[in-house]
């Protein structure tokens, strides 16, 4: 192996409680927030359902799911994510975000572990001295599926 550090492409997304870093391959599209269809008897983080390319997607607030404040809907965007499970029940889901995401190239030595601030739903890390959360997507998806 040469001396160059390994690189990966990621998407840095702003939320109410900070920023999350997702693998580029999980983000299908970023769209403008539209008022979702209401759903009954769901947790507060389950905002509603929305239509996207023939699919009915759950729209969730990752911030509320992780104990932060709700994103305001002004300037809100929606990140459409491919579900890792790839099941037919939930092939995609949607996360509320703030503003436009940023594509980033990340060298392995730029990402430093901050495990003391990690939780059930995310790993915490430093990216160029900025705290970012890396969602535990399997756990997030499992939680969403429990409420479909």
Positions of the model-derived regions?
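An acidic, low-aromatic, low-complexity terminal/linker signal
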Residues: 1-148
């Amino acid at each position: 192996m040469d001396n160059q550090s390994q690189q990966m492409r990621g998407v840095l997304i702003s939320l109410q409680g900070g920023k999350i870093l997702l693998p580029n391959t999980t983000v299908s599209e970023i769209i403008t927030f539209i008022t979702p269809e209401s759903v009954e008897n769901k947790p507060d983080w389950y905002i509603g359902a929305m239509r996207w390319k023939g699919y009915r997607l759950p729209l969730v607030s990752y911030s509320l799911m992780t104990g932060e404040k709700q994103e305001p809907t002004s300037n809100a965007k929606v990140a459409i994510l491919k579900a890792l499970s790839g099941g037919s029940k939930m092939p995609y889901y949607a996360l509320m975000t703030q503003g436009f995401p940023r594509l980033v190239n990340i060298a392995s030595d730029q990402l430093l572990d901050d495990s003391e601030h990690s939780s059930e739903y995310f790993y915490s890390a430093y990216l160029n001295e900025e705290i970012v959360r890396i969602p535990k997507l399997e756990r997030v998806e499992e939680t969403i599926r429990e409420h479909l």
